[in-house]
Amino acid sequence: MSDSFEATRTTRRRRPLQALTGLLAAGALVAGALAAASPAAAAVTSNTTGTHDGYFYSFWTDSPGSVSMDLNSGGGYTRWSNTGNFVAGKGWSTGGRKTVSYSGQFNPSRNAYLTLYGWTQSPLVEYYIVDSWGTYRPTGTFMGTVTSDGGTYDIYRTQRVNKPSIEGDSSTFYQYWSVRQQKRTGGTITSGNHFDAWASKGMNLGRHNYMIMATEGYQSSGSSSITVSEGSGGGGGGDTGGGGGSTGCSVTATRAEEWSDRFNVTYSVSGSSAWTVNLALNGSQTIQASWNANVTGSGSTRTVTPNGSGNTFGVTVMKNGSSTTPAATCAGSGGGTATPTPTPTPTPTPQSCSAGYVGLTFDDGPNTGTTNQILSTLTQYGATATVFPTGQNAQGNPSLMQAYKNAGVQIGNHSWDHPHLVNMSQSDMQSQLTRTQQAIQQTAGVTPTLFRPPYGESNATLRQVESSLGLREIIWDVDSQDWNNASASQIRQAASRLTNGQIILMHDWPAATVQALPGILQDLRSRNLCTGHISSSTGRAVAPSSAGGGGGGGGGTGSCSVSAVRGEEWADRFNVTYSVSGSSSWVVTLGLNGGQSVQSSWNAALTGSSGTVTARPNGSGNSFGVTFYKNGSSATPGATCATG
């Protein structure tokens, strides 16, 4: 392992916990050539791999002296304090379809994972099966769910380009993720179930390299003590659960609260409003309760049809020896007692806003599994919200970004891939925010004016970057703790503390948040509080503007509206394309920032060059472009439209 290779690894990381070390990977690659050794149960503090007590182990850190691992029988005790990045664990030099059992303690502060982790080659893939985490739950492009070992995992895929891997220090490869919806520390991971679920979504593995039950941390502190062993099974068939479809509709399952004897599941149907869903219970499972649908049948099969409450329903399943989520299939013909015609969405009743407005915020979207459910609930209740997507998720889910815009929610910026920005250089901060601005402009056609720093961490340098992009920093007054495994009732209780102008932190991905949202909106209505948007001037929740939709990319008066999409950018200038809708006879007023000036324009007649600029049609249609000189400000000029 050369010094140059280690130096490359030390500086390469941009997203916390996104990809493991080239140094660790290189060590694992040659693990088969290592002589079997049995180190004493002493603290390991330097980068190494080997065998101990019959298990392969790996230890890597870029902050020597701040992390140690004691090699104990069957597992290791790891301690870390204010470390940069590390990963440590025990497992097998050659992975595969193993049933892995583990137990112990995992006590992170801030950013860490407890994960079954490994690599394959041909194709080169880095994979994670995450059972618990600290302050950040990993996300990516949402691919579906898999139910295994008593829990439901969200499946994500991400890609790394020119990054260290087990094959060298400049590889391009996919990462596959299964992230448990409810945290746990201890149990069984049937890896074959995850491998099969990934394969069903085109996420194929190759020849297995190493596999370890790992603790990984980044810029955090904590401790873990994990004992690992291999079970008797080989992984079995894929227990993908979660949904299926036929003849025009599909159904997805979201696991919710769980107790020792029972658990809740929410099923959501798409593609038809006249549907029949068949649930296949496992073993001796029974249905204790249901809501928002008619449920009939006995034995191992239940038939579910609409009852006028929409296309989402829930059941409480008594385990009776099985914790597996009942599989669901959908038929769009309705059949039997299904509602013969689509059930209309209820028109929201007028609401008093005499107590003021509050800001519901959802971070880390959009996600295929939950975003549409959140938007559907908001629409049903005549409510709105502010969303803070990451640039990575925005780029990977353009249709959901359009869904955000069409639903009229306010769209802010949440960085490209959720790093600890305060530990980055100013240029890296600038890149994180600028790339996200561009991704949102390209996918939703709006320009954010709000920014929420990941983890709520900020400093003077970051605020300077925000200001240069015309962004207002938004934190929160109430933390729902949904990121920390809070239940739906706990999230709802947190929202009950909101008062006029205040903002609550929630996230796009937790199933419990989706389940809590209807109750939150009902509670606000009963208190004469309305949902609003966040003012970029004051940072407080206010009545939503009539323009709706985005985060400050445009506005309208009369019968036209205008949106802005940021284009090319250079050191001294940038391009913006403005698109007008609603009228062919329009006047757009542009508000330039600071010392900005107009260098050139196309497809419209412009009057003025600094301060306030007016644009009118010149016969070239309803889209026009402008090149602005920055002169100290990179913020996109705001635009309003009036018919003329």
From Swiss-Prot:
E.C. no: 3.2.1.8, 3.5.1.-
Gly residues biased stretches: 231-247, 547-558
CDD domains: CE4_SlAXE_like (cd10953)
Source species, domain of life: Bacteria
Gene Ontology BP, a term: xylan catabolic process
Residues of the GH11 domain: 44-229
Keyword Cell membrane: no
Catalytic activities: Endohydrolysis of (1->4)-beta-D-xylosidic linkages in xylans
Catalytic residues in the record: 126 (nucleophile), 216 (proton donor)
Pfam families: Glyco_hydro_11, Polysacc_deac_1
PROSITE patterns in the record: CBM2 (PS51173), GH11_1 (PS00776), GH11_2 (PS00777), GH11_3 (PS51761), NODB (PS51677), TAT (PS51318)
Region of interest (Linker ('hinge') (Pro-Thr box)), residue spans: 337-350
Region (Linker ('hinge') (Gly-rich box)): 231-245, 548-556
UniProt GO molecular function: endo-1,4-beta-xylanase activity; hydrolase activity, acting on carbon-nitrogen (but not peptide) bonds; polysaccharide binding
Region of interest (Disordered), residue spans: 222-249, 327-351, 536-560
Enzyme type, top EC level: hydrolase
Span of domain CBM2: 242-333, 553-644
Residue ranges of every copy of the NodB homology domain listed in the record: 356-532
Keyword flag Hydrolase: yes
Pathway given in the UniProt record: Glycan degradation; xylan degradation
SUPFAM superfamilies noted in UniProt: Carbohydrate-binding domain (SSF49384), Concanavalin A-like lectins/glucanases (SSF49899), Glycoside hydrolase/deacetylase (SSF88713)
Family membership noted in the UniProt record: Belongs to the glycosyl hydrolase 11 (cellulase G) family.
Function: Endo-acting xylanase which displays no detectable activity against polysaccharides other than xylan. Hydrolyzes glucosidic bonds with retention of anomeric configuration.
Identification of the protein by name: Bifunctional xylanase/deacetylase
